Amino acid sequence: FNRLPGFGDRPFDMGKHVAIIGVGDVMVDIAHWLIKYKKVERVTAIARRGPVERKYNPKEIRAVCSNMDQEGIATEFARIKDRLAAVGQNADEVLASMTAEFTKCEPTGSPSKMGFRFLASPKRVLVDANNRVRALEMEENKLEPKGEDTAAVGLKQLYEFPVDSVLFAVGDRVDETVGLPYKNGVYVTNPNKTGNDPDDSLFQAYDEKSGQIVEGVFLAGWARKASEGLVGIAKRDGDWCAEVITRY
């Protein structure tokens, strides 16, 4: 997917139906790859909450909206209609709003179909006798108000959702096991401004215990601010970090 040497050229049999867990911009990037380049039969994005809480940018969805299974999406809305109504969400209005974003769709040249499964929490990846993925075990959810937002609450109703592969596109925290100074979901950067442009401190890893920068370690893009902004913003951040490293 990301063309990483040593990994990007490995053969992976994705099968016909691929589930992507998550409904953010990373999900859209992966779906685009599966649809345009792998040409799988079906892609399903799995969401713990409902369509109102989807996180992808409407501009990003243009990359895959020409392959949306709109009939299947309407069926999915009918399935969860009562649970949306329970928190004051009108399924018909939400469906109209969501599908209205399917404009200026980019051609993919692929017969793939894409859909969504809402109010579903994956519990286990199920495999067959050959250790190949055969399904996701999922739990039905309902929505409950949480301040101005909503929270997914499990209904303890489990079911199997047949798929051939599962990809994960969730989480907005960096990996704290890397060993860099870590705090509140992000790696710590230098709080002491240097006055350069771009400012070195924004990209320098920093150890609060010693009060020193981590020599020779720089952070950029989502390693600096996890899941903030679109890919283009992360690229710009990488360009700035490259300037800082060159200066170093």
What are these regions (language model features)?
Residues 1-37, 188-206:
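Glycine-rich dinucleotide-binding loop and its adjacent helix/turn
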Residues 24, 49, 223:
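Residue-level signal for short, function-critical loop segments
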